[in-house]
């Protein structure tokens, strides 16, 4: 093959490679970053001001919506993942890292971690901002284990969380959970 015929063949190949690299870069940038919690953030279900509630929070980013859906409890955010109300493709879910929180009353405005990467304590004595049993997120397994030692519960990843822990009616007198069925979520992360 001479140089003259090789050039026209190599040019389309180079363009295809460049376009595929752009497409991959665009897909990676489609995941929105966490939004810092502000005084205007209202709960998706309750429309109450999120900052007025203690405990960890969740923000769920859904394709086609410019702002995240806010939840005053992580449990509520995880329930949204499996609810029939789910409005579309979930791009990413962020939760407060309680290992970086100032206190239970003040979990922080900017210490967000991806739910997919978090370790959760399920079935502890912790109550969330709405008074229901809370599913408590941590960036590290060690942080979650330390919390579980003090408050009870079991350390789990997102996919290990029991369906009953997020979708069953809330018993405000008990924090036990049935771990027979696990929550499988579809998040585009």
Question: Model-predicted segments: where are they?
Answer:
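Positively charged n-region of N-terminal signal peptides that target proteins for export
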Residues: 1-5
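Mid-length scaffold segments of soluble, non-membrane domains
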Residues: 67-106, 111-112
């Amino acid at each position: 093959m001479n140089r003259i015929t090789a050039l026209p063949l190599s040019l389309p190949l180079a363009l295809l490679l460049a376009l595929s690299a752009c497409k991959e870069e665009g897909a990676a940038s489609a995941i929105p970053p966490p939004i810092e919690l502000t005084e205007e953030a209202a709960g998706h279900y309750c429309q109450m001001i999120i900052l007025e509630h203690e405990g960890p929070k969740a923000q769920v980013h859904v394709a086609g919506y410019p702002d995240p859906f806010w939840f005053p409890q992580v449990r509520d955010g995880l329930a949204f993942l499996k609810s029939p109300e789910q409005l579309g493709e979930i791009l990413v879910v962020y939760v407060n890292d309680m290992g970086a929180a100032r206190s239970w009353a003040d979990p922080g405005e900017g210490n967000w971690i991806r739910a997919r990467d978090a370790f959760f304590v399920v079935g502890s004595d912790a109550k969330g901002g709405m008074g229901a049993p809370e599913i408590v997120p941590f960036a590290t397994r060690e942080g979650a284990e330390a919390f579980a030692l003090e408050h009870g519960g079991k350390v789990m990843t997102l996919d290990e969380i029991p369906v009953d822990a997020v979708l069953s009616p809330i018993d405000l007198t008990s924090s036990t959970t049935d771990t027979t069925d696990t929550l499988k979520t579809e998040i585009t992360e």
